[in-house]
């Protein structure tokens, strides 16, 4: 059998090299395409990232106007003015700003609740900026991305507060909260001009974040001390005491027979004294 000529062998090798090169190029381009697809965010994610950056930028602008004097350029705090905000998280900012306690009017024993200066959207922007510079406890959101409110009314909330959640929440509230806020969340006096506020005006997210972050004189309740579901049950109890109707009229702080008995005793004594004085003046 005749051996192929050197020219034919050379041509075959050239064809093989060409085919191998084309195959390698195809594999390389395909791999690069797959890798690019894997690491490049889709349009939805990229849009979300841009939205987050826009929110943080808006929050920084608001911070520079309202907060920088007391909390510093880098959120590090200013001596005798305001504490560091590094690591406090979205939750603490939402509670303080949304409840109107911040910006504070003047330094005193305790910041009072007042009408908020900023809208909820602006509050969330400031919270996003602070969280972007140190992290910390976050807000609670629903699956659709909206801020959780009524959804925090108990572990088993389904549009209505359940009696089981209220019962558990009541036990937890009396154990952990009643010593300061009294048995129905109406507040009470503390030492050195401080006080535990009435909880009627607080929304569900504010109450949740107050338990989580421990603002001002309040202790922190981490998820190890009170789980997320236990916090929700406490909120269910607080909201149930506010919204429970009072068939007898004015609830007298919802303190029960002690307050009602005291009122009737004082009122009755006054009526008797007035009647005695009237009888005396007629004789």
Curated annotation (Swiss-Prot):
Domain Cytochrome c: 54-134, 164-242
Principal localisation: membrane
Domain of life where this protein originates: Bacteria
Transmembrane segments: 19-39, 261-281
GO MF assignments: heme binding; iron ion binding; ubiquinol-cytochrome-c reductase activity
Cellular component, GO annotation: plasma membrane
Binding site for heme c 2: 177, 180-181
Effect of inactivating the gene: Cells lacking qcrCAB show strongly impaired growth in glucose minimal medium, which indicates that the bc1-aa3 pathway is the main route of respiration under these conditions.
Membrane topology: Multi-pass membrane protein
Alphabetical keyword list: Cell membrane, Electron transport, Heme, Iron, Membrane, Metal-binding, Repeat, Respiratory chain, Translocase, Transmembrane, Transmembrane helix, Transport
Binding site for heme c 1: 67, 70-71
Record localization: Cell membrane
Changes after translation: Binds 2 heme c groups covalently per subunit.
Reaction catalysed by this enzyme: a quinol + 2 Fe(III)-[cytochrome c](out) = a quinone + 2 Fe(II)-[cytochrome c](out) + 2 H(+)(out)
E.C. number: 7.1.1.8
Subunit structure, as described in the record: The cytochrome bc1 complex is composed of a cytochrome b (QcrB), the Rieske iron-sulfur protein (QcrA) and a diheme cytochrome c (QcrC) subunit. The bc1 complex forms a supercomplex with cytochrome c oxidase (cytochrome aa3).
UniProt miscellaneous comment: No stable monoheme protein can accumulate if the incorporation of the other heme group is blocked; assembly of both the cytochrome bc1 complex and the cytochrome bc1-aa3 supercomplex depends on heme assembly.
Role summary: Cytochrome c1 subunit of the cytochrome bc1 complex, an essential component of the respiratory electron transport chain required for ATP synthesis. The bc1 complex catalyzes the oxidation of menaquinol and the reduction of cytochrome c in the respiratory chain. The bc1 complex operates through a Q-cycle mechanism that couples electron transfer to generation of the proton gradient that drives ATP synthesis.
Protein name per Swiss-Prot or TrEMBL: Cytochrome bc1 complex cytochrome c subunit
């Amino acid at each position: 059998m005749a051996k192929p000529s050197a020219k034919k062998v050379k041509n075959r090798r050239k064809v093989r090299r060409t085919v191998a090169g084309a195959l390698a190029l195809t594999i390389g381009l395909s791999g690069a395409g797959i890798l690019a697809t894997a690491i490049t965010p889709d349009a939805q994610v990229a849009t979300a990232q841009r939205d987050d950056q826009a929110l943080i930028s808006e929050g920084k602008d608001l911070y520079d106007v309202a907060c920088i004097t007391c909390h510093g350029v880098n959120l590090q705090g200013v001596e005798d003015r305001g504490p560091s905000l590094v690591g406090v998280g979205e939750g603490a900012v939402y509670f303080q700003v949304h409840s109107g306690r911040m910006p504070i009017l003047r330094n005193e024993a305790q910041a009072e609740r007042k009408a908020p200066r900023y809208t909820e959207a602006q509050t969330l922007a400031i919270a996003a900026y602070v969280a972007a510079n140190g992290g910390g406890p976050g807000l609670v959101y629903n699956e659709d991305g909206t801020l959780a409110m009524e959804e925090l009314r108990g572990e088993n909330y389904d549009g209505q507060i359940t009696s089981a959640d209220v019962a558990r929440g009541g036990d937890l509230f009396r154990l952990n909260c009643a010593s300061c806020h009294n048995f129905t969340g109406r507040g009470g006096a503390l030492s050195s001009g401080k006080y535990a506020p009435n909880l009627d005006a607080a929304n569900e997210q504010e109450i949740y974040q107050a338990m989580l972050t421990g603002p001002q004189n309040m202790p922190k309740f981490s998820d190890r001390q009170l789980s997320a579901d236990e916090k929700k049950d406490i909120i269910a109890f607080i909201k149930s005491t506010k919204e429970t109707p009072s068939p007898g009229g004015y609830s007298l702080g919802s303190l029960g027979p002690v307050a009602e008995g005291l009122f009737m005793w004082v009122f009755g004594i006054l009526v008797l004294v007035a009647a005695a004085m009237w009888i005396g003046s007629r004789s």
